[in-house]
Amino acid sequence: MKFKIFGLFLLLSILNSCGDNIPPVELSPETKILYLGNGTEPKDLDPHTVTGVPESKILMALIEGLVIRHPEGLDPLPGIAKRWDISGDGKTYIFHLRDASWSNGDTVTAGDFVYAWNRMLMPSLGSQYPDMLYDVLNAEAFNKGKISDFSLVGVKALDAKTLEVKLKNPAPYFLELLAHYTTRP
């Protein structure tokens, strides 16, 4: 019995001595590093083409959309849009953007969302989730190649801080759709 206890003590001592004596890395406050336990490496980080959970976790942490999901449910909360107005018929949404910037310091504008949605709906891109925007006027027709002029799609930057979205029919769930990472610029 004494031999077993001694052997166990010896084994634990050897395992304890295997640790590195490397001090923790000191980071300055201005260092911006995202550490994320992701399970696997992402295949891509294009919000309009990825479909995997590892990629979506990173995109949700890096890019904010017009709205975000409440952490305890699906209710939409303001994201880049500090507020929005919905017309009486439920078919027009006006998003008022807050001050936000890209990682390089450029200002996030309503035009960034127009560009992103145009790109997401382009048939040649092969986005897996273009139907997230099919409630937008003419979005489905553009994505399926029935129309080629994106200006006919119901999304328009009224100015740098105001985005207008026109729907083909009222869609009470539309804000929840906008929380999905594929609708982000």
Where are these regions (language model features)?
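Sec-dependent signal peptide recognition
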Residues: 2-8
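C-terminal motif of bacterial Sec signal peptides marking the signal peptidase cleavage site
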Residues: 14-17
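Bacterial signal peptide processing site
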Residues: 19-21
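Immediate post-signal peptide segment of exported/extracytoplasmic ligand-binding proteins
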Residues: 25-35
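N-terminal lobe/hinge region of extracytoplasmic solute-binding protein
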Residues: 37-88
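Solvent-exposed, polar/charged alpha-helical surfaces in well-ordered, non-transmembrane soluble domains
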Residues: 43, 60, 64, 82, ...
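Surface-exposed binding/hinge segments that line
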Residues: 112-114, 121, 125-185
